């Protein structure tokens, strides 16, 4: 018998994960954050101890995919910083720059 993790490993498209686990999604959200959602789901699953019962394990996977998806319905991939390239990027300082600093001629 194939376990849920083996089944998920055989999937390639993000939409397949959502269909397999029965999680509803907005195509616009998925088109922008598909890799981020799946990576976040993987992080959540790696922190969880899956139940030995197949139905319970499937429910856990479904819940973690839903949780990861929800993260990106409320935020953006850049703000969530799932991938190293985003984590290493310099965060905007949000500091104030006065108009006089922008218009000084160097004197």
Curated annotation (Swiss-Prot):
GO terms for biological process: nitrogen fixation. Keywords: Nitrogen fixation. InterPro entries: NifW (IPR004893). Belongs to the NifW family. Homotrimer; associates with NifD. May protect the nitrogenase Fe-Mo protein from oxidative damage. HAMAP family: NifW (MF_00529). This is Nitrogenase-stabilizing/protective protein NifW. The lineage of its organism: Bacteria, Pseudomonadati, Pseudomonadota, Alphaproteobacteria, Acetobacterales.
């Amino acid at each position: 018998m194939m376990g849920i993790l083996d089944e998920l490993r055989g999937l390639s498209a993000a939409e397949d994960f959502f269909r397999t686990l029965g999680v509803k999604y907005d195509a616009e959200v998925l088109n922008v954050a598909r890799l981020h959602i799946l990576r976040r789901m993987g992080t959540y699953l790696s922190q969880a101890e899956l139940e030995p019962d197949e139905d319970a394990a499937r429910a856990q996977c479904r819940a973690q995919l839903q949780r990861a998806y929800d993260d990106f319905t409320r935020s953006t991939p850049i703000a969530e910083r799932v991938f190293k390239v985003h984590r290493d990027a310099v965060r905007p300082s949000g500091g104030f720059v006065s108009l006089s600093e922008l218009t000084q001629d160097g004197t």
